[in-house]
Amino acid sequence: MVKIGVLGLQGAVREHVKSVEASGAEAVVVKRIEQLEEIDGLILPGGESTTMRRLIDKYDFMEPLRTFAKSGKPMFGTCAGMILLAKTLIGYDEAHIGAMDITVERNAFGRQKDSFEAALSIKGVGEDFVGVFIRAPYVVNVADDVEVLSTHGDRMVAVRQGPFLAASFHPELTDDHRVTAYFVEMVKEAKMKKVV
């Protein structure tokens, strides 16, 4: 069984754990740097990206997270997690982890009061997935090797680049675990490649 970490500094940690377990993988709440060595994949949950960055810096997680990304182990960022994975952020000079060659705009759908749900078609996942958007970012631009998995209107809301997956919405806030299951499969495939 693959072991998937959920960065436990802030955000919808419990909900991600539940979704990972429902998808047939072991879930670990990651609160210490050394735990990164014990997991096969990592979820960066939604939350408030500025607060999350402060906590990542406070607990010296940034370089270990970048090292984890460079190791090729899969990472999945939802909402604020997408912001952490992006190489370019509109209106900001520097990236956070910067593992994905995507440009992201924060709070692109508006503030909290403008939160909404939308039925999405997601490549590799299926139709009618209810995306919960809360002060959501979206992807403005992608490199050629980034696969766009889903759009809402003309905005890219789910993308994949090799071992990295990012979504504007919160898949963990529904009882539909298909997006998490997709990530679990990515982790299984990556682990199998390492064994071979």
Swiss-Prot record:
Reaction catalysed by this enzyme: aldehydo-D-ribose 5-phosphate + D-glyceraldehyde 3-phosphate + L-glutamine = pyridoxal 5'-phosphate + L-glutamate + phosphate + 3 H2O + H(+); L-glutamine + H2O = L-glutamate + NH4(+)
Entry's EC annotation: 4.3.3.6, 3.5.1.2
Pfam families on file: SNO
Molecular function via GO: glutaminase activity; pyridoxal 5'-phosphate synthase (glutamine hydrolysing) activity
Catalytic residues (positions): C79 (nucleophile), H170 (charge relay system), E172 (charge relay system)
Coiled coil: none
Keywords associated with the record: Glutamine amidotransferase, Hydrolase, Lyase, Pyridoxal phosphate
Single biological process term from Gene Ontology: pyridoxal phosphate biosynthetic process
GO CC annotations on file: cytosol; glutaminase complex
Record bears the keyword Lyase: yes
Pathway where this protein functions: Cofactor biosynthesis; pyridoxal 5'-phosphate biosynthesis
Assembly and interaction partners: In the presence of PdxS, forms a dodecamer of heterodimers. Only shows activity in the heterodimer.
Family: Belongs to the glutaminase PdxT/SNO family.
PANTHER family linked to this entry: PYRIDOXAL 5'-PHOSPHATE SYNTHASE SUBUNIT SNO (PTHR31559), PYRIDOXAL 5'-PHOSPHATE SYNTHASE SUBUNIT SNO1-RELATED (PTHR31559:SF0)
Protein name in UniProt: Pyridoxal 5'-phosphate synthase subunit PdxT
